[in-house]
From Swiss-Prot:
This is Elongation factor 4. It comes from Lactobacillus gasseri (strain ATCC 33323 / DSM 20243 / BCRC 14619 / CIP 102991 / JCM 1131 / KCTC 3163 / NCIMB 11718 / NCTC 13722 / AM63). It comes from the Bacteria. Keywords: Cell membrane, GTP-binding, Hydrolase, Membrane, Nucleotide-binding, Protein biosynthesis. GTP binds at residues 23-28, 140-143. The keyword Cell membrane applies. The gene is lepA. GO terms for biological process: positive regulation of translation. Pfam families: EFG_C, GTP_EFTU, GTP_EFTU_D2, LepA_C. It is found in: Cell membrane. Its EC number is 3.6.5.n1. Required for accurate and efficient protein synthesis under certain stress conditions. May act as a fidelity factor of the translation reaction, by catalyzing a one-codon backward translocation of tRNAs on improperly translocated ribosomes. Back-translocation proceeds from a post-translocation (POST) complex to a pre-translocation (PRE) complex, thus giving elongation factor G a second chance to translocate the tRNAs correctly. Binds to ribosomes in a GTP-dependent manner. SUPFAM superfamilies: EF-G C-terminal domain-like (SSF54980), P-loop containing nucleoside triphosphate hydrolases (SSF52540). SMART domains: EFG_C. It catalyses: GTP + H2O = GDP + phosphate + H(+).
Amino acid sequence: MDIKKLQDYQKHIRNFSIVAHIDHGKSTIADRILELTDTVSERQMKNQLLDDMPLERQRGITIKLNSVEVKYHAKDGETYIFHLIDTPGHVDFSYEVSRSLAACEGALLVVDATQGVQAQTLANTYLAIDDDLEILPVINKIDLPSADPEMCKNEIEEMIGLDASDAVEVSGKTGQGIPELLEEIVKKVPAPNGDLNAPLKALIFDSKYDDYRGVVLSVRIEEGTVKPGDRIRIMNTGKEFEVTEVGVSSPHPVKKDMLIAGDVGYLTANIKSVRETRVGDTITSAENPTEKPLPGYRQIPPMVYSGMYPVDNQKYDDLKEALQKLQLNDAALEFEPETSQALGFGFRCGFLGLLHMDVVQERLEQEFGMDLIMTAPSVDYHAIMNDGSTKLIDNPADLPDAGEYKEVQEPYVKAEVMVPNDFVGPVMELCQRKRGEFVTMDYLDKYRVNVIYNMPLAEIIYDFFDELKSSTKGYASLDYEITGYRATDLVKIDMLLNKEPIDALSFIAHREEAQNRARQMTTMLKKLIPRQNFEVDIQGAIGAKIISRATIKPYRKDVTWKIHTGDPDRRAKLLEKQRRGKKRMKAVGKVEVPQDAFMAVLKMNDDDIKGK
């Protein structure tokens, strides 16, 4: 191993991430960089090339971080190795951003020249500052008529505190400014400085399951080197494996003889079980281990919980295996087994938000062929029991009877809404309607305001974002963080079908809204549950008290069609027999409940509740 050659190679490595608010053009800039450096041919090139998950291409958003190695021939005559990591912009996937930043020395901060700094721009920049990265401001979409690069530079300086006087102005669409951006990356992003002679120390920042090779680990080598044949140890589990292949993504896998300190690539080692590694673990050499593991990642707790059940109960084990494989590729997903009287065996899953929940469901259906029933999402509540203990409630059906607890606490968030001046009124009205408490309002410039409210997370996770977008014509951006739990007057509403409680339809609501919400839920269920051969009574109840009711009339078969019109006794007998049969059927009949009904709570917006 020629150490001088390796050190020279290391000096030419540049590891950087692209961070921005959603839709500010990160993936388009990544496309232009790949094109300009001839990493992919014109024939292979397609929009959002690094968004290789079918779901990303369908939705037009980045969901997963993705890394690629690019060779760039700079103006100084040297060839540089860029490891570019594209990251998501949606608040639900900020965990993916924090993981990708840990593998870098620099970050391109992309700001849309027509929109300026937005909520997630700030959130992602603070993540990069926390990781002590070199930040390069980039103003994108300068080809648009409404672009205002100077306004963006002022905002970056005033709101973030970064010098943006030499921010690179680019157009991801036309490629304008991309050559200058590549030169700036060479000059400003520092080379990695890991010790090549030290014992191997590598961070697992992502992973996926391959049916032929087992677990494929995405790694950033911090110190030392690794090559096929080396024995490695996962420091968290103590498990040892022999490396079978190392390489980089360019953007398709390319095998290499060795990965060295500073490299970002992949590694396989016949790891067959998804439980043997975890994102954030440190890999070291089995023969010459390092003393201390890398700090890893702060585990982000789920914000939203939902029940997930296979339509066919025989597929329970298949769903468990699919969730384990998906968790390998989606470290923020959490799940544990649960049983529902209505739906059988399934899992209680924790997600970072509703978009994350939708994405997990769609990936399970598309990639693993699962047919699923999802229950309505809820947040986790704390029930303070009479004996002083705290019980975590992530399923509304588990909330004990009112006499067993002193109070119920729900999670609160600090919500920051960036909005143009013209829409401050509608935003404040929306926040107050959602039980928000006004904190402060900061004027960012002549045109925009940052409105801050304390709000219950339960109000945010349903349709707050959609209502915010519609009340501000799409101009508002939202960021929020959990601030703690507060005691609130909450009650559990059970939904009963023919006097049988359906645990998967239970939900928790504020007492003042309980009757309206229960009434709305019974109306929704009446619309969504198809008619049966027997009458279906739908009731909403708090404890033993029924607070709402609706009835689905049965189909009625004409049992009198054979009878002569002049035989009223016979007619009455047949109708009475039909009534008795329906009564018996109602007592033993199983009501068919469609998937839509389990998500009915999501369709209950405020206008419906107020009966407008």
